[in-house]
Amino acid sequence: MVKALQYKTFGKPDVLQLVDLPLVHPKADEVSIKVSHVGLNPMDWAIMGNPEVAPNFGVKLPQTFAYDFAGIIDEIGPEVTDFKVGDHVFGTTMRGAATEQLIFSTKERGLFHRPDFVEDDVTSTLAVAGHTAAVALRKAHVTAGDTLLVGGAAGGVGIFTVQLAQILGAKVIGTASDSTADFLQDLGAEQISYGPGLADRLKNKEITAAIDLFSHETLKAALELGVKADKMSTVIMYPEPPAGIPTATGGEALPSDMEMILNAISNHQLTVPIAAKYSIDDYLEAIKLQMNRHAHGKIVLYF
């Protein structure tokens, strides 16, 4: 038997249960992964709490919680050629990642070899947030010389967006609470307080692009400052963003995006702060910490 964190009904984190599932063998094109770490994202509990939206993400009850993972391959099907037993891997799966054994079809996207220069706790945080940041930057056409406004810059996607934007040659100003000023400065960004009057506080900053990771306040301020819609993007789908501003999801990532992220880590251009690591048995504490939105960095569960 293997342990898994699942929900059988939609709702708040208290609907989650640790359950025992039978160990299974991979089919011809599948690999079995012994999961070591699970990276948490706000979408994990947002989808769990929204039965209207959940079907859009392929949720089928009972659903295994979370989507990002890292671990080691312990068995492969006879048709698998790109992976072998003992390979350290990471990625994302919409079938749910918080399980000691994850079966992954190699015909699907989303499974990557883990390089030696990075550990499982870090790679378990890369796929959803890193891919989403890469897509958001591409859709906002961020280039060298831009001054980019990032709304919600200290969050899980924000820490990737801030750093990847600088690799592209942009200057970054991030909205966040005043308590995160030093944290964002360490990532190379200037912090500015969110809330009423944002456009006024930004009027001398010469903003040329904007990415919204928290609320449409960022987009509204950027529009007020004259930023064009084709220089903006958002990860917030509901409510709909202002006309002409595209939404960005990690599912739209290019195959080259993860290679770019790993190269940035290898070249010390991108760091992934881990705010906290919790045993799978302490999943409620981990989720509650993320839900209060005051953690500086990613939150990880481990088996």
Language model features with spans:
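C-terminal hydrophobic helical "lid"/dimerization subdomain
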Residues: 259-303
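N-terminal Rossmann NAD(P)H-binding glycine-rich loop of SDR-like oxidoreductase domains
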Residues: 154, 162
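Adenosine-nucleotide cofactor-binding segment
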Residues: 120, 147-150, 166-217
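Residues forming the Rossmann-fold NAD(P)(H) cofactor-binding site
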Residues: 159
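NAD(P)H dinucleotide-binding glycine-rich loop of Rossmann-like/cofactor-binding domains
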Residues: 91-152
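Rossmann-fold dehydrogenase core element
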Residues: 230-272, 276
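Glycine-rich beta-strand-centered segment in the early N-terminal region that forms part
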Residues: 22-39, 52-95
